[in-house]
Curated annotation (Swiss-Prot):
Residues at which substrate binds: 62-64, 75, 79-81
Protein origin, superkingdom: Bacteria
Keyword flag Disulfide bond: no
Catalytic activity: dUTP + H2O = dUMP + diphosphate + H(+)
Cofactor: Mg(2+)
Provenance organism: Gloeothece citriformis (strain PCC 7424)
NCBIfam families on file: dut (TIGR00576), PRK00601.1 (NF001862)
Phylogenetic lineage: Bacteria, Bacillati, Cyanobacteriota, Cyanophyceae, Oscillatoriophycideae
A single GO BP: dUMP biosynthetic process
Reported function: This enzyme is involved in nucleotide metabolism: it produces dUMP, the immediate precursor of thymidine nucleotides and it decreases the intracellular concentration of dUTP so that uracil cannot be incorporated into DNA.
Keywords noted in UniProt: Hydrolase, Magnesium, Metal-binding, Nucleotide metabolism
Name used for this protein in its record: Deoxyuridine 5'-triphosphate nucleotidohydrolase
Length: 145
């Protein structure tokens, strides 16, 4: 399966897997910028993609940035639809107490290509019963007991 990528900027870095068994391709920043504490920024990558049929790209945080700097993807996972052909941008948010500098070439997020299942929506008067029912938001408890 092929992911077609166009560099919109000569210095853009193509997405790549670091290890052969990685699920996410690393995405890199194309410019330097700063994200103050509590704020978010759209970080450009300088690339556009053409996804394989019936797939989406999910933009996800990098665990190292989250753990060490409290930087994460704001709308995680960000969804890139199959038909989108514009620049891939990553919305990063700084949950930390210090300003964070994004530098050109820095790995800022990972992109996972996933299958998409399209459904036909059917309106019904009643849904089938389950043991869980409408219980949500903590209804299963906090411990495994």
């Amino acid at each position: 399966m092929k992911l077609k990528v166009t560099k919109l900027e000569k210095a853009a870095i193509l997405p790549k897997y670091v290890h052969s068994d990685d699920s996410g391709l690393d995405l890199s920043a194309i410019e330097d910028l700063e994200i103050p504490p509590g704020e978010s920024q759209l970080v450009p990558t300088g690339i556009a993609i053409e996804l394989p049929p019936n797939t989406e790209a999910q933009i996800r945080p990098r665990s190292g940035l989250a753990l060490k700097h409290q930087i994460t993807v704001l709308n995680t996972p960000g969804t890139v639809d199959e038909g989108y052909r514009g620049e891939i941008g990553v919305i990063l948010i700084n949950h930390g107490k210090n300003s964070f500098k994004v530098t050109r070439g820095m790995k800022i997020a990972q992109m996972v290509i996933a299958p998409v299942i399209r459904v036909e929506v059917e309106e019904v008067d009643h849904l089938s019963d389950t043991t869980r029912g409408s219980g949500g938001f903590g209804s299963t408890g906090l411990t495994s007991d």
